[in-house]
Amino acid sequence: MGKNVVVLGSQWGDEGKGKIVDLLTEKASAVARFQGGHNAGHTLVVDGKTTVLHLIPSGILREGVTCFIGNGVVLAPDALLKEMKGLEENGVPVRERLRISPNCPLIMPYHVALDQAREAKRGSGKIGTTGRGIGPAYEDKVARRAIKLADLFRDDLEEKLRNLIEYHNFQLTQYYKVEAIDFDETLKLCKEWKEEIRGMVTDVTEDLNQLRLAGKNLMFEGAQGTLLDIDHGTYPFVTSSSVTAGGVSTGTGIGPLYLDYVLGITKAYTTRVGSGPFPTELFDDVGAHLAKVGHEFGATTGRARRCGWFDAEALRRAVVLNSMSGICLTKLDVLDGLEELLIGVGYNLPETECAGAHDAEFYEAVTPKYETLQGWSESTVGITNYDELPENAKIYIKRIEALIGCPVDIISTGPDREETIVLRDPYDA
């Protein structure tokens, strides 16, 4: 029988999921995205060549791997076609390898306009969205008025679209005081999208299930990170989808008992893009060092990432939320040369009448408890054998394992897929 492996972020995103998915797809027959949209940014480095993917699963570069976009993803057809074009220009046969659920809600021009108008109106209180229409698209889905990919092929598309544009234009022009979205232009776009995407639409749930029954290895690729989950993250500074392992089943239709292994991708320190609380954030030279050496700039937005010490307490919670089987520790090499390393081992909690919130107010109010470990001067860049790691690096890894109650199964020591230590392969676990 094959194995079904989930790969997801365990912090605030940007943990290095793309590289690990690309690495592990050597043993997978299919890779499926199950949530989010083109707000994700997965960077792959293969033989020194960098590819950034926002919507298409990271397995697309592997010959013989089928990539699926599940119903939990909000689909921006214009972004998809642009990404496809870039890959095809580099010789990747995307149309042969990519399949898309007809149940994906579409990100329309009015969603992008709403997203950007809302952020502008919030001023200093902005959430820090990517401005790509993700939130408003999920909003329409939950309100049961979304235009889904399937609607492009149905006779009532024009009526649905006209009603929706009228509804959203009222908000845009009357409340946000910005330009209205043109109906005719949007309808024309929909007709173009239909023809471009037609050959890739499929019943993703059934296709994945048939692969499972045939004993094939499957992979489910998460976007963003656990602490950005709509339910379990630092609300309201979160994304609009279910980022945790539970989102796999709702976002693809593959039931939870069919999932064999959950891998949490985790940086050896902590980063966050945009607004929101960050208990272990650094504002000193060490924070600047992590940002510089770690090249901490968002693949989607280009925004500088905030950097801080490893937060073991936040990760311990992520392990529980996702029932993680193991973690992959990335960017260990960024810590090379630091004399001391601090780990956030817990929080000093404020008095409250409402325990267990774990939202933005909770994380703003806590102060971290730190434990200090000795760093290492040796380079870990490109090491592929655990025994070759500096002794203090091993101590750091073992301490993390003890604090979070989960084994470190993979260690990344550089951006290339080959610069990796695999202690336990998820497909062999």
Curated annotation (Swiss-Prot):
Its main location: cytoplasm. SMART domains: Adenylsucc_synt. Mg(2+) binds at D14, G41. GTP binds at residues 13-19, 41-43, 305, 331-333, 412-414. One of its GO terms (cellular component) is cytoplasm. The active site is at D14, H42. Its EC number is 6.3.4.4. Pathway: Purine metabolism; AMP biosynthesis via de novo pathway; AMP from IMP: step 1/2. Pfam families: Adenylsucc_synt. Its cofactor is Mg(2+). Binds 1 Mg(2+) ion per subunit. Keywords: Cytoplasm, GTP-binding, Ligase, Magnesium, Metal-binding, Nucleotide-binding, Purine biosynthesis. It is found in: Cytoplasm. PROSITE patterns: ADENYLOSUCCIN_SYN_1, ADENYLOSUCCIN_SYN_2. One of its GO terms (biological process) is IMP metabolic process. Plays an important role in the de novo pathway of purine nucleotide biosynthesis. Catalyzes the first committed step in the biosynthesis of AMP from IMP. This is Adenylosuccinate synthetase. It comes from Psychrobacter cryohalolentis (strain ATCC BAA-1226 / DSM 17306 / VKM B-2378 / K5). The gene is purA.
